[in-house]
Amino acid sequence: MVVITEHIEARTKQFETVPEAEAQGAIMMTWLTNQLADDTRPRLEKRGITDLDPTGWYNFQTFLDVMSEIVKSKQNVSMTLVAVGKGVVENLPLEDFPSIEAFQAFVENLHGASVRNMPETESHVVIQEDSNIYIVNNTPVSNDLMYGFWWEMLRLYSIGGIKYRPIPHQDYPSNEVGTIFLLQPEKR
């Protein structure tokens, strides 16, 4: 079994980042437009965010605080955060990945392309082990949000012509640090 600590030097705490970390507006727009935006939009509005510029950069901790608030509310937590994650995919210009190497490059650059000024320890990692593909979430982003993101992306796009589904594999609770997702090939 894949053990997260074998692949990551320092585990990132969920919902915490450095003060200078900023998130790209195009990614964060999902908080205002996702399927359950009636729940997420007011949480941003009370923090003074009513509109987002897709080309702008915003304090990343604000969005982590909203995620944390949703988790602490204990109301529709998974459903809300999965909806936000799925909504992110709508804002990205993606296409099928021709190979696992292309997918791995995308995954490993994803967090760094959408968040700047972050600690080097924050990342997503793809591991190929025992004929399986795993994604490690070592970011402060909710595991439920990342599950929604991977679910929607892999629903729409294939890797090397194969469709996959993310399966929570290890350390999954949404209020814990990091997790591992197993990418399971769809049965035809």
What name fits each language-model region?
Residues 149-157:
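Conserved short hydrophobic interaction patches
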Residues 2, 115-143, 157-188:
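Short terminal or interdomain "cap/linker" segment that borders an active site or interface and mediates
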Residues 146:
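Hydrophobic (often cysteine-bearing) scaffold residues that line and stabilize catalytic clefts
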Residues 18, 29-30, 34, 61-66, ...:
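Generic signature of intrinsically disordered, low-complexity segments enriched in small/polar residues
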Residues 47-143:
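Amphipathic interaction/junction segments at domain boundaries or subunit interfaces
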Residues 1-74:
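Terminal low-complexity, intrinsically disordered regions
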